[in-house]
A protein has these predicted regions:
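Structured, non-membrane catalytic/scaffold regions adjacent to prosthetic-group chemistry
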Residues: 25, 29, 34, 77-78, ...
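N-terminal secretory signal peptides and thylakoid transit peptides that target proteins
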Residues: 195-213
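Hydrophobic alpha-helical topogenic segments used for membrane insertion/localization
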Residues: 103, 128, 209-219
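Intrinsically disordered, low-complexity terminal tails and inter-domain linkers enriched
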Residues: 140-197
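Secretion-targeting segments and adjacent low-complexity export tracts
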Residues: 205, 215, 220-232
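Juxtamembrane/transmembrane-helix boundary motifs in multi-pass membrane proteins
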Residues: 3-7, 64, 114-118, 199, ...
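Membrane-embedded alpha-helical segments of integral membrane proteins
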Residues: 63-149
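Membrane-anchoring hydrophobic segments
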Residues: 1-92
C-alpha cells in the first residue's frame, strides 16, 4: 500500500510539473507576470497583512521574494502529491486538484492591477494539461483509461480476486497468468492464466511517465530559452541607450567627502513588490500624463531625453527601514525635471495628488504641492553614470527628494494621473500607510560594527545621517548613556543627500554602548522613542554595543 501511495503521489507531482511547464511556456508569449506562480505570489503579497509584510522584509531582506515563490512551489508540490493519491482512489476527486489550482491561478492573474484577458491563458492551459494527463495517465491501483494500454501482463494495480484464479493476498510475485503481489501484501488475482482485468502494466506506467517527463523537460527548457531571449533583447535595448549630457549637471563632490559617499549601483537597496523584474523596451515605452489637466501629454523615451535633463546627487530611503537599517542609499541621478512637465499640462484647480503607475500595476501617490515647491523631483533615466538598471526602474522611474520611496519614487513608470487624495488611494495607502510621507530625520553608526571587539585607545566612530530636503545640522554621540557629544560633520553634496559624520572616542577597556542622534536643518532633533516603520517611518536612536579589550 505504501509503495502504491508513493507512486500515486509521484504521478501527481509529475502531472503538476507538466502543467506548470506548459503554463510557464505560454507565459513567455503573454507576459512574465501572467505565469501562475508569479500571479499567485503577487496576490499573496497584495493580500498579506501589513505586519506580515514588515516581518518578511525585516527578517529576509532582499530574499523575501525568492522565499515566497519557493514557499508557493512547495505548497503546489504538496497539493499535487495529494491530488495524485486522491486520483488513484477516485478519479473524479483527483480532477478537483487541477480545477482548484487552475481557478486560483486564473483568479490571481486576472485580479492583478494591470491584468488583461490573455493573462488567464497560462493558468487555464496548465490546468487543462494537468487534468488531461491525470485522467489518461495510468496510476498504480487504478484501472487504465479505455484507450490506454491494458494490463494484460505484469499488473501493478490491485485486482479483485477472480473466481478460479489466484487468491487475494498471496505473497508471491505473480507472472502474467498468476495471482501476485506488488509487495504490499495485496494480491492481483488471475483466472485461468489471465492478468487482472483493466489494470495498468508496469511497462505502461513507466512508458507514459517517461513521455510526460520528457515533454515536461522540453516545455520547461523552451520556457527557459524564451525567457533568456527576452532578457537578452531587453538588455540590448538598454545597452543601446545613449544618455545625453545634462543641461544642469551635478556639482562636483566637495573636498573631504569620505569614500563610500555614493552607494555602488550593485549595492543599492531594492524594496518593491515585483516578483519578476519588468524589462521594458525603450522603443515602445510611452509616458501618459492625464487626469485633471488642461492638456494631456504623451511622451516617448527619446522625447523625454530631449527635455533638458538635470543631474543630482540624491539619497533615497525606504519607509520599511528599521532604525539603523540598510534600506537607504545615495546615487547620482539623471532625469527630466517633473515640474515643467506638470506645468505644461496645465493642472486644474483642486488637484492635489499625482498618481504614478508602473508597468506592473503599482500606484504611488505624491502631493502635487511637493512636486512644485522647487525640489529636484524628476523622471530619472540614469543612475551613477549609466542607464537605470532593470531592477531600479529602467527605462524611467520617478524620484522625489525628501519623500519615502512609497510616496514619490515609482519604478518602471508608464503613467501619471493628476487627481485628488479624496478620489484615489494609492497601493500602500490602501494598506494603512500614511498618505503623505516626508522622510524622518535618521542617523546610523556604521563603525565600529555591532558586537565588535576592539583594542583600547583612540577609536573613530563613524556613520551617516539623513533628512532629505531639510539637511542635517548636527550629529551627536552618547557613550554608555552619558552626555551627548558633538560629532564632526564631513562635507556633503546638498540637503538632499546624507551627511557622513565621525566622532573621536578614547575607548577604555570593558563593555560599552554607543548611541547616535541627529538634528535636521529646521532644528528638530530625532526623538528617542522607538517606533516601528508602520505607518510613516521608524523613529528612535541607533544604538550598538561592543567590547573594548
Amino acid at each position: 500500500m505504501i509503495r502504491r501511495t508513493l507512486a500515486a503521489a509521484g504521478t501527481g507531482l509529475l502531472v503538476a510539473a507538466a502543467g506548470v511547464a506548459v503554463a510557464e511556456l505560454l507565459a513567455t508569449a503573454v507576459r512574465p507576470q501572467a505565469a501562475p506562480l508569479v500571479a499567485v505570489g503577487g496576490a499573496v503579497v497584495d493580500g498579506a497583512p501589513t505586519p506580515v509584510k514588515e516581518w518578511a522584509v525585516r527578517t529576509f531582506g532582499t530574499y523575501d521574494k525568492p522565499l515566497l515563490l519557493g514557499g508557493i512551489g512547495l505548497a503546489l508540490a504538496l497539493l499535487a502529491a495529494l491530488t495524485g493519491i486522491a486520483a488513484r482512489r477516485r478519479p473524479a476527486l483527483g480532477l478537483l486538484g487541477p480545477a482548484v489550482l487552475g481557478l486560483a491561478g486564473v483568479g490571481a492573474a486576472l485580479t492583478r492591477p494591470d491584468a488583461g484577458p490573455a493573462d488567464a491563458l497560462p493558468a487555464l492551459a496548465g490546468a487543462a494539461v494537468a487534468a488531461g494527463l491525470l485522467r489518461r495517465l495510468p496510476l498504480p491501483g487504478r484501472p487504465a483509461a479505455p484507450n490506454t494500454p491494458d494490463a494484460a501482463a505484469d499488473p501493478v494495480g490491485v485486482g479483485r480476486a477472480a473466481s478460479g484464479g489466484g487468491a487475494a493476498g498471496s505473497a508471491g510475485v505473480g507472472g502474467p497468468g498468476g495471482g501476485g503481489s506488488d509487495g504490499d501484501g495485496h494480491g492481483a488475482g488471475g483466472s485461468g492464466g489471465s492478468g487482472s482485468a483493466g489494470g495498468p502494466t508496469r511497462r505502461a506506467v513507466v512508458r507514459n511517465a517517461t513521455l510526460v517527463a520528457a515533454g515536461t523537460v522540453v516545455a520547461a527548457a523552451g520556457a527557459a530559452v524564451l525567457r533568456r531571449l527576452n532578457v537578452a533583447d531587453a538588455a540590448r535595448s538598454r545597452e543601446a541607450v545613449r544618455l545625453p549630457a545634462p543641461a544642469s549637471p551635478a556639482r562636483p563632490l566637495p573636498a573631504g567627502v569620505a569614500p563610500g559617499f555614493r552607494t555602488p549601483t550593485e549595492e543599492f537597496y531594492r524594496v518593491d513588490t515585483a516578483l519578476t523584474v519588468p524589462r521594458l523596451d525603450v522603443d515602445t515605452w510611452r509616458l501618459r500624463l492625464h487626469g485633471l489637466v488642461a492638456r494631456p501629454v504623451e511622451v516617448s523615451f527619446a522625447e523625454l531625453l530631449d527635455r533638458g535633463l538635470i543631474e543630482r546627487d540624491v539619497t533615497l530611503s525606504c519607509v520599511s527601514n528599521e532604525v539603523g537599517g540598510p534600506y537607504v542609499g545615495t546615487a547620482r541621478w539623471l532625469g527630466a525635471p517633473l515640474a515643467p512637465l506638470l506645468r505644461a499640462a496645465g493642472i486644474r484647480a483642486g488637484a492635489d495628488q499625482l498618481v504614478a503607475r508602473s508597468d506592473e500595476g503599482m500606484t504611488i501617490g505624491t502631493p502635487i504641492e511637493t512636486l512644485l515647491d522647487g525640489r529636484d523631483a524628476m523622471l530619472a533615466v540614469g543612475m551613477n553614470g549609466a542607464p537605470l538598471p532593470f531592477a531600479h526602474g529602467f527605462p524611467v522611474r520617478m524620484l522625489t527628494p525628501g519623500l519615502y520611496g512609497y510616496a514619490g519614487a515609482c519604478k518602471w513608470v508608464t503613467e501619471l494621473e493628476v487627481t485628488t487624495f479624496d478620489a484615489f488611494d494609492a497601493y500602500w495607502v490602501r494598506r494603512g500607510w500614511a498618505r503623505e510621507a516626508p522622510v524622518k530625520t535618521a542617523s546610523r553608526i556604521d563603525r565600529p560594527a555591532p558586537f565588535a571587539r576592539i583594542p583600547a585607545g583612540p577609536v573613530t566612530v563613524a556613520g551617516v545621517a539623513w533628512a532629505q530636503h531639510r539637511g542635517i545640522a548636527a550629529v551627536e554621540v552618547s557613550v554608555n548613556g552619558g552626555p551627548w557629544r558633538a560629532a564632526e560633520l564631513l562635507p556633503t553634496a546638498s540637503t538632499d543627500t546624507w551627511v557622513q559624520w565621525r566622532y573621536a572616542w578614547p575607548a577604555t577597556a570593558g563593555p560599552h554602548s554607543l548611541r547616535v542622534r541627529a538634528t535636521d536643518g529646521t532644528g528638530a532633533t530625532q526623538p528617542e522613542r522607538r517606533r516601528t516603520p508602520f505607518p510613516d517611518g521608524a523613529t528612535g536612536h541607533h544604538t550598538i554595543t561592543l567590547t573594548v579589550r
